[in-house]
């Protein structure tokens, strides 16, 4: 009997990125189910699964090697480690070959860079189900991949992925325009109520319970929702993580420059405020690399905060005041493209918020 067999061997454990948002290791789609297994897990225990169709592979950040068995024949997949990492399959039912006869069985082997057009081309032309998942789009696939196509469209139009990020940011702002307008109008009302809120704080300064009740009564009377300012931020959190995912996993973003000192949008801003952005001949350690773009992002966030009403709670107000500085430090190691997106998102938000609140001020005077 003849049994179809295929195997991918990795001789030693590679250097992997080690980031939770990216899978590097064994990867397969078996009967429509995505299977991802880490190297260290397979060293401890082998993986076995029987399927009717799919593919078997080993995936790096930017590369994939895979074997696709012939469709219509059941096969067993095994990931194991015996001094080498092995991903293999073998058909479960043999084909009898008689004397002076032959059979033909076609399997496909793909070793490719994870460029989206290449991977999607293989998936479509070879009819490989879910082969596009070899690029780790994440659980927000339905946002991440369309967002990449939007970026790629503007890249082809404008010739620079940094400009494409800005263009997509404008489109996102336009998409959320009605929600943002509602939020800014509510915050504008909150700002106009500041004198009355100050009066209530003075009146009930010794009784926090009565102050809270008076505040809630004021909000109800003026039809103001103090939490409405959070809505635009909450809605855009998935977009933020989708941008992060795209910049981290797609080969198209690797070594793509922006204007000025940004030579790779997928890497952090290489400048540092601690050596005056290169004017002092000193290379600070990585934790001190707070570059120009993170600082620009922090400044835009600080200015944007000034357009918002001051929180009634003094402790909350202090936390909000230091929040831009906190985010500047947190986002400094992130991809420059992500920080550029957040900076321009802040700028467009400020413009919209200023226009809405200016109109409200004119109406009340």
Describe the function of each predicted region.
Residues 158-161, 329-339:
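Transmembrane helix interruption/hinge and helix-loop junction motifs
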Residues 245-298:
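Conserved catalytic motifs of ABC-family nucleotide-binding domains
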Residues 1-129:
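Soluble non-transmembrane domains of integral membrane proteins
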Residues 132-145, 202-209:
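Short, membrane-interfacial amphipathic segments enriched in basic
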Residues 100, 174-240, 249, 300-332, ...:
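Membrane-interface amphipathic helices and adjacent TM-edge segments
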């Amino acid at each position: 009997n003849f049994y179809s067999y295929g195997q991918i061997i990795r001789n030693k454990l590679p250097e992997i990125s080690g980031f939770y948002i990216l899978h590097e290791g064994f990867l397969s789609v078996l009967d429509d189910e995505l299977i991802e297994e880490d190297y260290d897990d397979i060293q401890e225990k082998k993986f076995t699964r029987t399927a009717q169709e799919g593919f078997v592979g080993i995936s790096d950040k930017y590369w994939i090697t895979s074997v696709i068995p012939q469709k219509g024949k059941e096969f067993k997949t095994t990931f194991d480690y015996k001094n080498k990492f092995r991903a293999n399959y073998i058909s479960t039912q043999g084909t009898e070959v008689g004397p002076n006869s032959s059979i033909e069985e076609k399997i496909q082997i793909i070793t490719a860079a994870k460029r989206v057009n290449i991977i999607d081309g293989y998936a479509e032309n070879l009819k490989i189900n879910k082969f596009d998942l070899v690029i780790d789009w994440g659980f927000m696939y339905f946002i991440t991949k369309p967002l990449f196509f939007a970026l790629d469209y503007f890249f082809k139009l404008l010739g620079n992925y940094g400009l494409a990020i800005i263009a997509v940011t404008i489109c996102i702002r336009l998409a959320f325009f009605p929600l943002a307008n509602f939020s800014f109008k509510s915050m504008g009302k909150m700002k106009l109520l500041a004198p009355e809120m100050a009066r209530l704080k003075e009146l009930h300064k010794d009784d926090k319970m009565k102050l809270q009740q008076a505040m809630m009564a004021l909000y109800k009377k003026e039809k103001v929702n103090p939490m409405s300012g959070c809505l635009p931020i909450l809605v855009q959190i998935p977009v933020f993580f989708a941008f992060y995912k795209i910049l981290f996993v797609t080969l198209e973003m690797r070594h793509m420059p922006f204007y000025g000192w940004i030579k790779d949008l997928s890497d952090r801003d290489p400048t540092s405020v601690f050596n005056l952005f290169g004017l002092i001949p000193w290379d600070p350690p990585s934790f001190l690399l707070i570059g120009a773009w993170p600082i620009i992002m922090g400044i835009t966030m600080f200015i944007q905060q000034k357009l918002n009403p001051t929180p009634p709670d003094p402790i909350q107000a202090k936390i909000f005041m230091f929040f831009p500085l906190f985010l500047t430090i947190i986002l400094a190691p992130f991809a420059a493209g992500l920080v550029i997106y957040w900076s321009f998102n802040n700028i467009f938000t400020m413009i919209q918020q200023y226009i809405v609140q200016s109109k409200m001020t004119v109406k009340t005077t």
